[in-house]
Design a protein with these regions (language model features):
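Glycine-rich phosphate- or other oxyanion-binding loops that anchor nucleotides, phosphorylated ligands
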Residues: 1-141
Length: 141
């Protein structure tokens, strides 16, 4: 997460992903952000089930070592609330081939200036509840 107050205890429904990786540029025209197309459908799903969520921009990067103070600050100024490693590329591929992508995230670590919190990483990466939620989403679309 880049905004702990906004994302803590909530699912993150990305609206756009900053393209800080290379894959998406092979499948979509060059631009800084790629729109995440089904975020509003997912928001309706989460709202109907009274699941806590927040919508916002995210930053896709394939290089954790380049999550520098200045780049983190810049992405936050642009409205990014989380950072992840795949979404821009997966959305670009989905758009290219005509697939529907339904993406939600859970913050496991928090990048805040001068600190890096990792307390939630294990649960975010290994909690099976997200798999069951994804299966419910797949059945409902």
């Amino acid at each position: 997460s880049l905004e702990k107050e906004a994302t803590d205890g909530k699912f993150i429904l990305p609206t756009e992903a900053y393209r800080g990786e290379g894959l998406s540029y092979y499948f979509a025209e060059p631009q800084d952000y790629i729109k995440i197309k089904n975020t509003d459908k997912l928001a309706e799903f989460f709202k109907e089930r009274k699941l806590p969520y927040v919508q916002g921009r995210v930053w896709t990067t394939d290089s954790m070592l380049r999550e520098t103070v200045n780049l983190v600050r810049k992405r936050k100024e642009e409205g990014c609330i989380a950072v992840e490693m795949e979404l821009a590329g997966v959305q670009a591929i989905s758009d290219f081939y005509g697939f529907e992508l339904y993406d939600f995230l859970v913050a496991g670590d928090v990048l805040i200036e001068g600190n890096y919190e990792t307390d939630g990483l294990s649960a975010a990466n290994h909690d099976l509840d997200k798999l069951f939620l994804a299966l419910q989403i797949a059945k409902s679309v």
